[in-house]
Amino acid sequence: MADLMKFVQDEFVTRKDFPVFGAGDTITVFYEIKEGEKTRTQFFKGVVIQRRGSGNTETFTIRKMSGAVGVERIFPVNLPALQKIEINKKGAVRRARIFYFRELTGKKAKIRDKRR
């Protein structure tokens, strides 16, 4: 049964080629919003908190600061409304899920750049 589900996912789900990113990276996600009959592109720029799942059900969480309020948004990787993902900065973190980042404020909330 699992083989059948994997086959269907591989054959019929259209995957877009997004860059490889992980926790700690600062990315910008461009996605389409429909308002009535109009469609427009909006972007969400923030730090990747986590990637979870695999295959068709994979999602990633982004956190940004809007004023003094933290805003998190969860995006499915296979969302048809996703247009593109840009990596602004690669971050050096030691965890795959950086939930501790939610409590940090000020200079402590800064993520070091990954050395190349």
Curated annotation (Swiss-Prot):
Coiled-coil region list: none
Key words of the record: Ribonucleoprotein, Ribosomal protein
Pfam family, one: Ribosomal_L19
Domain of life: Bacteria
One of the record's GO cellular component terms: cytosolic large ribosomal subunit
Gene3D superfamilies: 2.30.30.790
One record GO biological process: translation
Single GO molecular function: structural constituent of ribosome
InterPro entries: Ribosomal_bL19, Ribosomal_bL19_sf, Translation_prot_SH3-like_sf
Functional summary from the UniProt entry: This protein is located at the 30S-50S ribosomal subunit interface and may play a role in the structure and function of the aminoacyl-tRNA binding site.
Protein family per UniProt: Belongs to the bacterial ribosomal protein bL19 family.
UniProt name for this protein: Large ribosomal subunit protein bL19
Organism of derivation: Flavobacterium psychrophilum (strain ATCC 49511 / DSM 21280 / CIP 103535 / JIP02/86)
Lineage: Bacteria, Pseudomonadati, Bacteroidota, Flavobacteriia, Flavobacteriales
Gene that this polypeptide is encoded by: rplS
